[in-house]
Amino acid sequence: MLIPRRVKHRKQHHPGRSGAATGGTKVSFGEYGIQALSPAYVTNRQIESARIAMTRHIKRGGKVWINIYPDRPLTKKPAETRMGSGKGSPEWWVANVKPGRVLFELSGVNEEVAREALRLAIHKLPLKARIVRREGGE
C-alpha cells in the first residue's frame, strides 16, 4: 500500500477537485497510459488494486509506472458520534486526481495486451478514464 512515511500535519483540508490537471497530462515513461476524464479522490487501495489487475494480465512482460501518489489524508468520525468535538481521525490516504492526468503507464507488451490490461485497471478506479498512446517520433 502506498502511504507517506512522515507528514508534517496529520490532518489536512480537503483539496479542491475543480479545474483540469496542469502537469502530468502526457504519457512520458511508457507507451500506453490511463488518462482521467473526471475528477476524483483515488485511494491507496484502489491504486494497488489497479496495479495488481494490470500486472496479472501482462504476466511477466512489460513494465508499469504509477504516476499518482496518495499524499492527502481523509478523516472520518466514528459511527454514532455526536457532531462537534473536533475533526475525526485519518482513515484513508487519497490522491487528488483532476481531469487530464495520466495515472498509470505501461510498456514492453503488444497493443492488444496493453489495452486489455489498462481496461481491467480502469474498472478498479472510481473515475471515468480513457486509454492513451504516447505521442512523438519514437
Swiss-Prot record:
Presence of the UniProt keyword Transferase in the record: no
Keyword Nucleotidyltransferase: no
SUBUNIT field: Part of the 50S ribosomal subunit.
Protein name per the record: Large ribosomal subunit protein uL16
Disulfide bonds: none
Residue ranges, annotated region (Disordered): 1-24
Molecular-function annotations in GO: rRNA binding; structural constituent of ribosome; tRNA binding
Gene Ontology biological process: translation
Job of this protein: Binds 23S rRNA and is also seen to make contacts with the A and possibly P site tRNAs.
Organism of origin: Paenarthrobacter aurescens (strain TC1)
Family matches, as InterPro entries: Ribosomal_uL16, Ribosomal_uL16_bact-type, Ribosomal_uL16_CS, Ribosomal_uL16_dom, Ribosomal_uL16_sf
